[in-house]
UniProtKB/Swiss-Prot annotation:
GO biological process: tRNA wobble uridine modification
Protein name, as recorded: Carboxy-S-adenosyl-L-methionine synthase
Pfam families reported in the protein's UniProt record: Methyltransf_25 (PF13649)
Entry binding sites for S-adenosyl-L-methionine: Y39, G64, C65, S66, D89, N90, D117, I118, N132, R199
Broad enzyme group: transferase
Family label: Belongs to the class I-like SAM-binding methyltransferase superfamily. Cx-SAM synthase family.
Organism: Escherichia coli O7:K1 (strain IAI39 / ExPEC)
Assigned EC number: 2.1.3.-
InterPro entries, A to Z: CmoA, Methyltransf_25, SAM-dependent_MTases_sf
Molecular function terms from GO: carboxyl- or carbamoyltransferase activity; S-adenosyl-L-methionine binding
């Protein structure tokens, strides 16, 4: 059962850096719905993309799966035999709850839920890979290598879904969308103290890129096509496609 996020409603003397610990895992569904505009749409559309891209006898990877929302959306939309979903997260608290969520919904497609580092996972025989608000928590210097590995592990015609919080090269636009996002959180019941404390904890851990930077990395990895398919304020999602005739 998810609880309402009140983690930062009182002043915290020493904030430290953000971690996906048991306290965060307990309130995560409420937190992300109230903090990430368009999150529910992205999750449901990931399922629609899965219906289009997942092929028989292949694997789907959910890298940084948290509580398994994207995994469940994908699994609901797989209608082929001999497919498997591999869901990975490095947070023990998230993985424990993810396993409970996956087990609560029965479906023919098996799911391997793995506690581990996505940088160490081999990507093989993949028709679809999901990075849903995950890449932004890696060191920027490590992001290209992960995208390279994903491209190599995708089958021809496969797709990567990359959802992120964005920064903007146009400072005026960036300021507007930053403020709109804060308005969104206020409208969802977060106080100025909650917004400020969470931002302070995240600022050294979540380092955002522009859409242009993401597209450049995807192109360097080998993806022939990539495009922003969803955006709400400074959050959005790209889809990158490996050509059907790729070697």
């Amino acid at each position: 059962m998810s609880h309402r996020d009140t983690l930062f409603s009182a002043p915290i003397a020493r904030l430290g850096d953000w971690t996906f610990d048991e306290r965060v895992a307990e309130v995560f569904p409420d937190m992300i719905q109230r903090s990430v505009p368009g999150y529910s749409n992205i999750i449901s559309m990931i399922g629609m993309l899965a219906e289009r891209f997942v092929q028989p006898g292949t694997q789907v990877y959910d890298l940084g799966c948290s509580l398994g929302a994207a995994t469940l959306s994908v699994r609901r939309n797989i209608h082929h035999d001999n497919c498997k979903i591999i869901a990975i997260d490095n947070s023990p608290a998230m993985i424990e709850r993810c396993r409970h969520h996956i087990d609560a919904y029965k479906a023919p497609t098996p799911v391997d839920v793995i506690e581990g580092d996505i940088r160490d996972i081999a990507i093989e025989n993949a028709s679809m890979v999901v990075l849903n608000f995950t890449l932004q928590f890696l060191e920027p210097s490590e992001r290209q290598a992960l995208l390279d590995k994903i491209y190599q592990g995708l089958n021809p015609g496969g797709a990567l879904v990359l959802s992120e919080k964005f920064s903007f090269e146009d400072a005026k636009v960036g300021e507007l969308l930053f403020n709109m996002h804060h308005d969104f959180k206020r409208a969802n019941g977060y106080s100025e103290l909650e917004i400020s404390q969470k931002r302070s904890m995240l600022e050294n851990v979540m380092l955002t890129d522009s859409v242009e930077t993401h597209k450049a990395r995807l192109h360097q990895a080998g993806f022939e096509h990539s495009e922003l398919w969803f955006q709400c304020f400074n959050f959005g999602s790209l889809v990158a496609l490996k050509a059907e005739d790729a070697a």
